[in-house]
Amino acid sequence: MPVFTDVRPRWSRPASGGAHPPECRVKPLPELTAFLEGLPEPHILFDAQYRILASNAAYRRQFSPQRSVIGRHCYEVSHHFAVPCDHAGESCPLALSRQSGQRERVLHLHHTPRGEEYVNIELSPLPGEDGQPAFYVEKMEPLRVAHSQPDAPGLIGRSLPFQRMLALVARVAPSQASVLLLGESGTGKELVARAVHQASPRAGKALVAVDCSSLTETLFESELFGHERGAFTGATATKPGLVEAASGGTLFLDEVGDIPLPMQVKLLRLLETGTYRRVGSTELRHADIRVVAATHRDLDRMMADGRFREDLYYRLCTFPIALPPLREREGDIALLAPALLERVAAPRRLQLSASAMALLQVQPFPGNVRELRNLLERAALLCDGDVVDATHVEEAIATGRRPGRAPAAPPLPRSPAGTTDLRSLERDTLRALVAAHTGKRAELAARLGVSERTLYRKLRQLKLD
């Protein structure tokens, strides 16, 4: 924990024999409490039974402004859990620290007066006189680049695959390491790159995106490094490159797998030496950039085929992050769909009906979030009222279907009046479709625009099989 760099050794540094001399033992609780109170980030001190012994003003203000936290369990105050985090499906830094005997760091979704917030937690054990941990200190820093609510900016999600990805973003962002984002098309790689930038010390400078797939071999060098006046035909003025524009900030190389092989050598030199030359110049310039790259291509296969340099790959892939496809982010469609609909339908204020949401949640979305966005934009254009219903989603699916694909499903039956539970609506809809269908399940899946496996999974989940 960085804030304990200067003071923690006075509490916990062991002597050469392993024992803690009197001057290095844990100091009295009042002194620890006074130290925590002066820290700007939320901190708590608690024992091995998760009981909070002390908290600073920043913690009380963020998590429990109306009620004392002393004597309460940390998981109760921060998470509203009745059991420790690791018993509720989340990582528990205390449990991890007990196993490792070291400092631990995790990402949690905490409850605050403002609602749920993603929080980076760093836990440090403080040894007692016997050398064993006597207390634990947690430092909490909100991660502002992601949210679990649909009306928030930035990354949106709360599924476990999303949280695992977000934990990697939170871990690498404060460093200067190169990041390689890997994932299918439409998974939001540019949004994740922006999150890495905004959570980094370079957030005050520019994030410059380079679409590598749109640059020809002749344009790549002049766009990236810039050129001098007269360097080539048409170069009527000196032009700084994108590397220079990103100085002090982050250079985002989107679709890095599409960089021509001859240009990969020049990019490698930039990454290895931190220097470059404008086209037509002999002056060596220094690049102050952090590189985040992204691709949907299989770089391992490209390296095996000789289409991507292995040395460049290892320069870019200091810290790889795999972005989960939408089909693996169970529950996130319910968060993403309202947020995307609000953006694509503006200035109209459209709502999604429960039946429309149920239909969206059984779609496979091979195009991921981008496909979901396009589908919602079509549905909004097909809707004349204020509510996008399942019929609008069905029509949007049908009109967006590529030639040769299966026809759209028949209109969904209207749900019973007064039914508001989303799972019940989904069950009623599928039950009616299954009852009305006389052919094979594979045909029904095709008519719904989903795979047979997805249909069987939904039927099992809803106990309709």
Residue spans of the language-model regions?
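Sensory modules in modular signal-transduction proteins
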Residues: 23-61, 174
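Conserved post-Walker A coupling segment in P-loop NTPases
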Residues: 168-234, 244-260, 325-330, 375
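Bacterial C-terminal helix-turn-helix
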Residues: 1-27, 59-62, 111, 127, ...
